[in-house]
Swiss-Prot record:
Originating species: Streptococcus pneumoniae (strain ATCC 700669 / Spain 23F-1)
Catalytic activity of the protein: UDP-N-acetyl-alpha-D-muramate + L-alanine + ATP = UDP-N-acetyl-alpha-D-muramoyl-L-alanine + ADP + phosphate + H(+)
Residues noted as binding ATP in the record, renumbered to the chain: 110-116
GO BP: any one term: cell wall organization
InterPro entries in UniProt: Mur-like_cat_sf, Mur_ligase_C, Mur_ligase_C_dom_sf, Mur_ligase_cen, Mur_ligase_N, MurCDEF_pg_biosynth, UDP-N-AcMur_Ala_ligase_MurC
Keyword Hydrolase: no
GO molecular function annotations of the record: ATP binding; UDP-N-acetylmuramate-L-alanine ligase activity
Protein name: UDP-N-acetylmuramate--L-alanine ligase
GO CC term (a single one): cytoplasm
Length: 444
């Protein structure tokens, strides 16, 4: 039966994906959010989903209301109105926990690589059989007839605790979100609690020391590069400018050669996890092999464009581990070019907690440009850290730039520009693109 859904904060990456999925399943969907443009709204607008400004008049007691986790009585008029008038609503993760019970569900959790791996699993499985999915880049697909549901499982504030999927991948465990988690042990405990809720199969990266300590009532399968101690092993790697080719073995049995048109060692691991899960779930590996070849990636994860013969890469990387992986991927695809990193730190708490790690990661580039720290709506800038503190720890050529003046980026020949961050780093990218376009116009 068709329902009407209202999303409070519809432009959020998970919220927009869920809105699209429910819309495609035949439901009426609308939502509210701030006016500022966010990359997720393009898909919503293309689907004809109405995006309204926040207003208590948007709410109707006959709607099913889903509220983004960032919106609370102290910062949102719709939440206040709902609370005062007894209008019920569910948080995103609460709704998702009940929704997935109607499917064979497959989650992807982990500190890094969730979105790319969810996208890869969704792409392959939806080409094999009818599948609904939610990807953290704002992409969602819904089918009323789907048996399978693939989703991204987020650890922040332990939002994944309502989830009880049949299968799940955990890509890694790392200390992040220092505004919520108190330590690596705290992060581990959250993932370990989640692991206990998996019912049929848990697939974890076997070369992560923290993941080796995970326990679950479901069978645990380890994947990795090392033959010893892992169930699914990727070997015979061939990394080229067109992607990566590798062989997978399962407990000594050769499952064949696979190719992905994406870059970086981390994507080989993501693919190995997907292969392991789908093999264990009983899917034809020839079909898995065929559809891995056509996976082109997800939004804001190594997204490339060429402006005035200049290669520009946009990536969501905002943690040192992610920066290293992104720069590794750039070097694989462009081995003869200078790798120029343009990075915007995201949140003051993360920058303080991981300052030395950020410097180490950024030193993998040939040159580094830094934007001002992007503060989260969840925090206040107490002046404890400035972007210059990070700049002082970088030993490659570096400079702090402003969005109004990105011309220092022109000081490079034969370079690839890698813009990274989870804030508004794209405004710097667009400023640079305009500069490049103007140079062409002036020459002509």
């Amino acid at each position: 039966m068709s329902k009407t859904y209202h999303f409070i904060g519809i432009k959020g990456s998970g919220m927009s994906a869920l809105a699209l999925m429910l819309y495609q399943m035949g439901h009426k969907v609308q939502g509210s959010d701030v006016e500022k443009y966010y990359f997720t709204q393009r898909g919503l607008e293309q689907a004809g989903i109405t995006i309204l400004p926040f207003d208590e008049k948007n709410l109707d007691g006959d709607m099913e209301i889903i509220a983004g986790n960032a919106f609370r009585p102290d910062n949102n008029v719709e939440i206040v109105y709902a609370d005062q008038n007894g209008i019920s609503y569910k948080r995103y993760h609460e709704f998702l926990g009940s929704f997935m019970r109607d499917f064979v569900s497959m989650g992807v959790a982990g500190a890094h690589g969730k979105t790319s791996t969810t996208g890869m699993l969704s792409h392959v499985l939806s080409h094999i059989t009818d599948t609904s999915f939610l990807i953290g880049d704002g992409t969602g697909r819904g089918s009323a007839n789907a048996k399978y549901f693939v989703f991204e499982s987020d650890e922040y504030e332990r939002h994944f605790m309502p989830y009880h999927p049949e299968y799940s991948i955990i890509t890694n465990i790392d200390f992040d979100h220092p505004d919520y988690f108190t330590s690596l042990e705290d992060v581990f405990n959250a993932f370990n609690d989640y692991a206990k809720q998996i019912t049929k199969g848990l697939f974890v990266y076997g070369e992560d020391a923290e993941l080796r300590k995970i326990t679950s009532d479901a069978p645990i399968y380890y994947y990795g590069f090392e033959a010893e101690g892992n169930d699914f092993v990727a070997s015979d790697l061939l990394r080229s400018t067109t992607g990566s080719t590798f062989t997978v073995h399962f407990r000594g049995q050769n499952l064949g050669q696979f190719h992905i048109p994406t870059f970086g060692r981390h994507n080989i691991m993501n693919a190995t996890a997907v292969i392991g899960l789908l093999y264990t779930a009983g899917f034809d590996l020839n079909l898995v092999r065929e559809h891995l070849k056509t996976f082109s990636g997800v939004k804001r994860r190594f997204t490339e464009k060429i402006v005035n013969d200049t290669v520009i890469i946009d990536d969501f990387a905002h943690h040192p581990t992610e920066i290293i992986a992104t720069l590794d991927a750039a070097r694989q695809k462009y081995p003869s070019k200078e790798i120029v990193a343009v990075f915007q730190p995201h949140t003051f708490t993360r920058t303080i907690a991981l300052l030395d790690d950020f410097a180490h990661a950024l030193n993998q580039a040939d040159a580094v440009y830094l934007a001002q720290i992007y503060g989260s709506a969840r925090e206040v800038d107490h002046g404890d850290v400035k972007v210059e503190d990070l700049a002082n720890k970088i030993n490659k050529k570096h400079q702090v730039i402003t969005v109004e003046n990105v011309s220092p980026l022109l000081d490079h020949d034969n370079a690839v520009y890698v813009f990274m961050g989870a804030g508004d780093i794209q405004t710097y990218e667009y400023s640079f693109e305009r500069l490049l376009s103007n140079l062409t116009s002036n020459v002509q």
